Amino acid sequence: MLSAGNYLAARSLATVLFLSLRMKRPLFLEGEAGVGKTEIAKVLAASLDRPLIRLQCYEGLDIASAVYEWNYPAQMLEIRLAEASGTTDRGRIEADIFSERYLIRRPVLQALSSPDGRAPVFLIDELDRTDEAFEAFLLEVLSDFQVTVPELGTIRAAEPPIVIITTNRTREVHDALKRRCLYHWVDYPAAAQELEIIRRKVPRCNEVLSRQVVAYVQKLRTLDLFKNPGVAETIDWATALTELDRVALDPETVSDTLGTLLKYQDDIARIDGAEGRKLLDEVKTGLAATG
């Protein structure tokens, strides 16, 4: 399924995703930023021909931004028009302005509504950026797949969405929420898997350069960097090198393109020098030894 969408998944990930679909349980994906957690939901939605609804989490995320809110300007306009026309029936005005016509559906409510009959893939991205109060609310939603709008009543999902939750583990998410889900830790890919990813995503990158790129990135991840390069950065670096018509790595090229691979100046300053050259020598020696 994922391979059809050009996503190379480890067997353990493919298995837990299959079980999540069959058991109709949310899938909780945890791992470092840049390992491809978000991409899983995108590829899954495309493979199943389902709409993708994404709730991007952030500090301070509230119900109005995540679930629903009322279109207050339109409601006020309707009230003014009613007053201008001489309408005095307050109950009728209230029923009108608190109807579906003025309801703005945010991602949670969108995920519970499938007008075309196809339950969407609901991506709750970077849940660890929110607070415990929002976690508690989300736990309630995932328990029954329903939301109560006081003015309209309870809105239930005719078919529960396929839920993918991701976190970068900047803080621990409450156990109660995790227990509702199937869990999988998404790690950086092994060298062979990352090489295959480059072959698929950057087909113009020649084999020698692809192997050097992967070996270099794999070695970088063993260092105590502020932020290790993810798979997305590996792809970006291979793409940049290809656009520069490079066929192999050399110290000058590595120095010129580090900004596509590393995103913090302290990391760049450390690698852009003797340590980076030593790393490149080790890569070339290692690849030469393995043929």
Per-region residue spans from a language model:
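C-terminal regulatory/interaction module of P-loop NTP-utilizing enzymes
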Residues: 1-291
